């Protein structure tokens, strides 16, 4: 595995993560798993990147599916992780496991992909993740309305969540926005 830092140290794969993923991938259709570490470059993405991580193969998607079908190694693979993950070990591990599965040949976000990631590196709870809390605050700040108003009783309360509440906390009627 190579890594280029450009002045900042490149991310490192936590001890045992590749081995845990390899165990879970036994018997599954993951044609690049055996060559995953050989041509893998791990780096930090650019500041301001909106994604937590991404996997990039050097060849186009048609060639990747052809190589997957033929069982041929994919060639050089780059996994870029968002630098904000430096502050959150659990989310870093979860995101890296997700991207390593793509590098192993699980290209789709299906049930198998989700099951393996949640078993090997479960996503942290919102309250346990400083990065997720920060991202949640950014989303809430960007919403046009800062409060909810019940259409039935007129009760007003501060908006702390992105999704619409099911019921008014005062009158308990089904929530209808005013």
What are these regions (language model features)?
Residues 5-90, 107-178:
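Metalloprotease/metallohydrolase-associated module, dominated by Zn2+-dependent proteases
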Residues 94-106:
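Active-site recognition of the HExxH zinc-binding catalytic motif
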């Amino acid at each position: 595995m190579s890594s280029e830092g450009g002045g900042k140290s490149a991310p490192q794969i936590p001890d045992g993560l590749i081995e845990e993923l390899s165990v879970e991938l036994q018997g599954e259709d993951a044609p690049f798993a055996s060559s995953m570490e050989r041509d893998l470059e791990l780096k930090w993405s650019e500041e301001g990147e909106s994604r937590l991580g991404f996997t990039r193969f050097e060849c186009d998607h048609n060639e990747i599916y052809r190589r997957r079908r033929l069982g041929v190694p994919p060639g050089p693979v780059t996994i870029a992780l968002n630098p904000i993950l430096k502050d959150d070990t659990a989310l870093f591990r979860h995101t890296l496991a997700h991207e390593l599965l793509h590098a192993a040949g699980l290209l789709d976000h299906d049930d198998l992909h989700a099951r393996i990631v949640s078993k090997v590196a479960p996503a942290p709870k919102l309250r346990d993740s400083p990065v997720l809390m920060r991202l949640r605050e950014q989303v809430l700040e960007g919403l046009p309305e800062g409060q909810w108003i019940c259409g039935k009783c007129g009760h007003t309360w501060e908006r702390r969540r992105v999704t619409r509440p099911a019921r008014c906390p005062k009158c308990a009627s089904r929530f209808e926005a005013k």
